């Protein structure tokens, strides 16, 4: 009986990792389990740092002795016992790949199957003339030549050298020794017993004359013999020159290999590597398979609206390059160009001469020496400087490769077709379209029986994997999408789809908020996908705040009651039905007892708008939209509808550039913005990490660390020892531990496994040396302070206003539970974003700021969302404007204004389908076909 209990459940006894308070918990196996609770309550600690970490540790124990030698250094989770634990796989929100060669297709392995499909049943076409490519046997070639016009005089040639540099004396000598008498050299027939001199730096073509013969039945054997000899001599290729009495001769190309006879081009046999952009066999030779190339961007080199003598040409004046600056002044003087003018005010001839040069010799002085140099033009000067200095990355832009048009492959690979489509077509179509294409067997009915047998298992694998992506709400993505541009939520759902495709059973999957970035419309799709994963005999533990996901769980574990030191307890575990009868925070929001409501603020009396015109990017075509200022505005819409394209890729960079450079014009790259005079800055608070090293933490990022170091340096003991504030920095020598260089951890390279961080055995993770730690404030060392939660530190430093005021802003955004010295790499995207928000709150406010946030509710419990809403509205109350990309209905329904994009993702999106107050968008949902409006209407009932 005891054995059955262990097999049916995962039993955790005495979990004390981080803030967990000796937790005992039984989790049913093979079920859909949701962990919920306030941010910082301990959900992720229990799911990832305890269950998953122990699963990984046990896996390592099963490895070789080489791997096991590190196990004593890899910390075991602080837990007494875990029974019934199965192999664990974590699917978190960390970006899938930073590799520019990774795409959605490569991550999911769909691209591998596409490569196989194209290699096995693809039809080759000539990339030049678009004619089908075919191959011929020797007998086919003989037959075709014998059927040429009767009595035609022909020369059968064996191509030896094709358009290559060299003198080729050895080749010519070899032909002589083999008995050849004549050859065509660069199109002219020569005798091989005569002296032939070829220039080794020029390209040459050499063709051996195998035979000269007349087409008739008597010469059939002679023709066959000559053809076989020519094919052997030139490795499967030959040329036939048909002589005509009163007209130029005609050339015909024949090949045993695949070739275009019209263009006289041969092609290699197709193999999967022919379609790999990571292999020389398939990669575009221009961009080496990246699809993009870096080149100088004129708009970054030159500001056309700034006077020439005030730094308009950044590449010359931006780096204080006096040599080029003096040459530039000499050029302007010689050509009569007034440097007080802007580039736009010069005539066309002057502009061209400035940019591209005009070959004139320029006299100028450099370091008191007269010099004379030709003016090459700004662009050539920039290239020269880049080659010399390699520091002009600020003036470079990544642009689509002109050779492969961004498709990464060689022209010969891109011209191959399957079912009438090229590889580029499959990579650029939305996944939804790709799924429907492969789901229709009539597209492949043209294949013969042998090809169908080959293609069938490949098509099955492609269809399954594409369906899983479509099923998790990613139908708007493309298989060619760069993995670096994928959000954390999208990345996680891609890996969920991949796991379903792997068919594993008996696995414990630990997921971190898979609903992030999903519109309410797609949430049920995701839940069904998770169910499919669970039904394969797996246990799912999902850390989640989404109402629908919680309501569809088999078992819910609520960690709380609050965050940080006030959390770490299991306040509820059981079914959803029992949860709704409970009276703690999560249950109160789920059963409607508590609601998230906006604070009461007076709306602005004056109404101003920011209008964006002529937006053309990705799926947005010629869009213009008005955004109200001094309000909380939500940009909504299904995934892939164009929200990020409009706000993050268009409004944000354009507005920042125009404001930062005080542009006279209000347009940039064709996009026009009206209403910028009502703003003085635009701030984007994203979810990127606040730092990439263990020495980055909330204290250093917000600036509170500087004040704390000053306070420690002011202590009597510190003054006696001559310690300055820098003594208490772990970024410089002096006070830090030199063994770990202030990291607190040491990285151990595992070679065949990911590197492992272990605590420094010298400072025990304190980051400082013993002498520094002897200095105390109110009995606490600098390491003790960094180990405090923000809430504890706020109480500790209550009498130090400069420190307390910065800590208060962190508490205001719901981050009282994080520690001051918490490693930046361990913070979630949502936490990093709120730390940035706290930093902004601590600055002096001008009341003319536009804040842009992308899904700030990421990782937030209902209680935390309520808290965040108050902060956002408080910034608006000060006269600022708040623009939020969001799917969370609790934020959307409490916004002042909504701009809804859609109606769907990808090509079916890119339009503003609804705008107005939440009530207006909800009331007009049937007319506008707004999915957001429909869900909003249910929420506002």
Regions picked out by a protein language model, each given a short descriptive name:
Residues 1-941:
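Conserved phosphate-binding elements of NTP-dependent enzyme cores
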């Amino acid at each position: 009986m005891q054995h059955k209990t262990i097999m049916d459940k995962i039993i955790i006894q005495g979990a004390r990792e981080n803030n967990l308070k000796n937790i005992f918990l039984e989790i049913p196996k093979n079920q859909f389990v949701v962990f919920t609770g306030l941010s910082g309550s301990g959900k992720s600690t229990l799911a990832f740092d305890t269950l998953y970490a122990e699963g990984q540790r046990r896996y390592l124990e099963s490895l070789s002795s080489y791997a096991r030698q590190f196990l004593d250094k890899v910390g075991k989770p602080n837990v007494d016992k875990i029974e019934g634990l199965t192999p664990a796989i974590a699917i978190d929100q960390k970006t899938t790949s930073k590799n520019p060669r990774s795409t959605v297709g490569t991550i999911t392995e769909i691209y591998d199957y596409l490569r196989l499909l194209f290699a096995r049943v693809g039809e080759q076409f000539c990339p030049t003339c678009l004619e089908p490519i075919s191959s011929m046997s020797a007998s086919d070639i003989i037959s075709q030549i014998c059927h040429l016009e009767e009595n035609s005089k022909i020369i059968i040639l064996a191509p030896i050298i094709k358009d290559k540099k060299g003198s080729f004396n050895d080749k010519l000598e070899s032909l002589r020794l083999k008995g050849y008498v004549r050859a065509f050299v660069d199109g002219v027939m020569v005798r091989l017993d005569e002296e032939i001199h070829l220039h080794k730096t020029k390209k040459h073509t050499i063709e051996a004359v195998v035979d000269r013969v007349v087409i008739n039945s008597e010469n059939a054997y002679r023709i066959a013999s000559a053809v076989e000899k020519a094919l052997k001599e030139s490795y499967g290729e030959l040329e036939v020159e048909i002589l005509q009495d009163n007209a130029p001769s005609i050339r015909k190309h024949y090949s045993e290999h695949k070739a275009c006879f019209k263009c006289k081009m041969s092609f290699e046999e197709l193999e999967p590597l022919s379609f790999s952009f990571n292999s020389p066999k398939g990669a575009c030779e221009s961009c080496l398979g990246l699809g993009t190339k870096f080149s100088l961007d004129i708009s970054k080199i030159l500001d056309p609206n700034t006077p020439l003598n005030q730094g308009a040409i950044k590449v010359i004046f931006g780096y204080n390059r006096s040599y080029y600056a003096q040459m530039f002044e000499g050029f302007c003087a010689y050509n009569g160009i007034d440097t007080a003018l802007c580039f736009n005010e010069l005539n066309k001839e002057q502009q061209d001469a400035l940019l591209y040069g005009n070959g004139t010799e320029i006299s100028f002085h450099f370091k008191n020496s007269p010099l004379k140099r030709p003016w090459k033009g700004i662009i050539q000067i920039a290239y020269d400087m880049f080659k010399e200095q390699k520091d002009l990355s600020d003036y470079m832009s990544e642009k689509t490769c002109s050779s492969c048009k961004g498709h990464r492959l060689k022209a010969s690979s891109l011209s191959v077709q399957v079912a009438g489509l090229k590889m580029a077509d499959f990579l650029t179509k939305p996944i939804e379209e790709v799924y429907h294409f492969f789901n229709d067997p009539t597209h492949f009915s043209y294949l013969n029986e042998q090809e169908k047998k080959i293609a069938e298992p490949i098509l099955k694998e492609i269809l399954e994997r594409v369906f899983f992506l479509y099923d998790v709400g990613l139908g708007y993505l493309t298989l060619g999408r760069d993995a670096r541009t994928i959000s954390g939520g999208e990345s996680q759902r891609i890996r969920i789809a991949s796991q379903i495709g792997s068919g594993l059973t008996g696995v414990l999957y630990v997921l971190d908020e898979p609903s992030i970035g999903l519109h309410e419309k797609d949430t049920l799709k995701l839940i069904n996908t998770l169910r499919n994963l669970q039904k394969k005999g797996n246990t799912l533990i999902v850390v989640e705040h989404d109402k629908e996901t919680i309501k569809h769980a088999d078992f819910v574990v609520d960690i709380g009651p609050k965050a940080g030191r006030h959390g770490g307890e299991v306040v509820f575990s059981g079914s959803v039905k029992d949860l709704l009868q409970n009276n703690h925070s999560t249950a109160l929001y789920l059963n409607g007892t508590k609601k998230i409501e906006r604070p009461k603020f007076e709306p602005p009396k004056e109404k101003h708008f920011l209008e964006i015109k002529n937006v053309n990017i990705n799926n947005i075509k010629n869009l213009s939209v008005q955004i109200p200022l001094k309000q909380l505005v939500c940009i909504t819409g299904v995934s892939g509808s164009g929200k990020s394209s409009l706000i993050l890729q268009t409004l944000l960079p354009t507005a920042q550039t125009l404001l930062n450079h005080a542009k006279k014009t209000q347009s940039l790259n064709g996009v026009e913005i009206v209403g910028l005079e009502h703003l003085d800055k635009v701030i984007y608070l994203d979810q990127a990490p606040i730092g990439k090293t263990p020495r980055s933490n909330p204290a250093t990022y917000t600036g509170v660390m500087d004040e704390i170091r000053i306070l420690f340096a002011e202590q009597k003991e510190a003054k006696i020892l001559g310690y300055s504030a820098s003594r208490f920095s772990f970024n410089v020598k002096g006070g830090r531990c030199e063994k770990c260089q202030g990291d607190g951890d040491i990285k151990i390279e595992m070679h065949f496994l990911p590197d492992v961080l272990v605590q420094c055995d010298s400072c025990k993770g304190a980051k400082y040396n013993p002498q520094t730690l002897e200095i105390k404030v109110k009995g606490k060392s600098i390491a003790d302070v960094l180990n405090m939660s923000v809430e504890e530190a706020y109480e500790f430093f209550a009498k130090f206003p400069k420190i307390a005021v910065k800590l208060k802003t962190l508490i205001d955004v719901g981050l009282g539970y994080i520690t001051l010295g918490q490693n930046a790499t361990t913070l979630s995207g949502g936490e990093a974003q709120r730390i940035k928000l706290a930093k902004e709150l601590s600055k002096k406010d001008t009341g003319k700021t536009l804040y842009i946030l992308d899904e700030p509710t990421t990782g937030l419990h209902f209680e935390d969302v309520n808290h965040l809403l108050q902060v956002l509205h408080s910034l608006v109350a000060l006269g600022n404007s708040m623009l939020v990309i969001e799917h969370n209905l609790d934020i959307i329904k409490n916004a002042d204004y909504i701009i809804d994009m859609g109606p769907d993702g990808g090509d079916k999106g890119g339009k503003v389908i609804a705008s107005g107050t939440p009530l207006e968008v909800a009331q007009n949902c049937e007319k506008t076909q707004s999915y957001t409006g429909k869900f909003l209407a249910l929420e506002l009932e």
